[in-house]
From Swiss-Prot:
Belongs to the UPF0597 family. GO terms for biological process: L-cysteine catabolic process to pyruvate. This is UPF0597 protein BT_2080. Disulfide bonds: none annotated. HAMAP family: UPF0597 (MF_01845). GO terms for molecular function: L-cysteine desulfhydrase activity. The lineage of its organism: Bacteria, Pseudomonadati, Bacteroidota, Bacteroidia, Bacteroidales.
Amino acid sequence: MIESERKQIIDLIKKEVIPAIGCTEPIAVALCVAKAAETLGMKPEKIEVLLSANILKNAMGVGIPGTDMVGLPIAVALGALIGRSEYQLEVLRDCTPEAVEQGKLFIAEKRICISLKEDITEKLYIEVICTAGSQKATAVIAGGHTTFVYIATDEKVLLDKQQTANEEEEDASLELNLRKVYDFALTSPLDEIRFILDTARLNKAAAEQAFKGNYGHSLGKMLRGTYEHKVMGDSVFSHILSYTSAACDARMAGAMIPVMSNSGSGNQGISATLPVVVFAEENGKTEEELIRALMLSHLTVIYIKQSLGRLSALCGCVVAATGSSCGITWLMGGNYNQVAFAVQNMIANLTGMICDGAKPSCALKVTTGVSTAVLSAMMAMEDRCVTSVEGIIDEDVDQSIRNLTRIGSQAMNETDKMVLDIMTHKGGC
């Protein structure tokens, strides 16, 4: 691999694997509000928020960090009151109990209007209009959770969409495939990719914090219980499940704990990281082996998300667990062909799992994905792979990946609409 291409891949990873506090969809909304409020230059009197269906879906039922509250209104209020856009996906890290009380008052005074943006094709779209007196400021995020495509005041446009479109085209020019991902992870100079260890540090700390409390459905904590050990054993496998689900428990409940995200999703970052970390640590792997396995996992996720898109009707845990299955397979001693077998097995098993928004029960889906990742790796190490005569699997692993992403980004669009319709029209539980 030539040095310029390697540098391009490293830049892509550093852009896609970043810290985040809280679920990235409501946090991205808070980020957009913060930018609009900063552009306005004063505390807004009114805030209008227009969202794509996928953003709305992922922000309805998830905890907001530091608030003990669920949903968009408090995220919007805090974005305006204490949010700082320079913090990116940690925009609410300065949140205090006093700020939460101010946010509640802001909501009670009916200063916030949130609605669905009609007639747009973007699945990730956030538009915020902040007003104070006769002054107005607008900010728009589209395509990526931190990608501003439009910023304006009454007087002038500060950022236009064309500038950002050029940047996105530059990213799109980097074409990945599984072989290139594998070769990059295994041959890059270690010091150039050592930064990926930050994912292990942050995401493991999130899991360990979750073990001390009661977050969400406490699935991770439950899996460490005496009864559960009688059923599943005190094994590497049970530890992989407990650590991964615990970090998800804490994040979905709104714990003020940073995690390292992947492609705009904290749960994807967790699922791509912790199974690999736990397997490596409990099998005595070296730091270099851990670094390369983590890089293989995270870059596989980024590669698949390139064609799937950041938000879709397909659960992102499917993609992220596919990455960790690759990392685990390699740590087991697998070669490229066996890593490809693991990917084929994952696609054959989990394609079609719906995304019905970010919420505490995502920990269940994360656990399903991760358990399948281990199973797929074990099959791959026995040279067992779902064949091209079965279902959507192709002889070429990259074509199988494209089949997965076509289903997730195109075929499941009607599913996405139905899921949102159900979520927005159901009665109280």
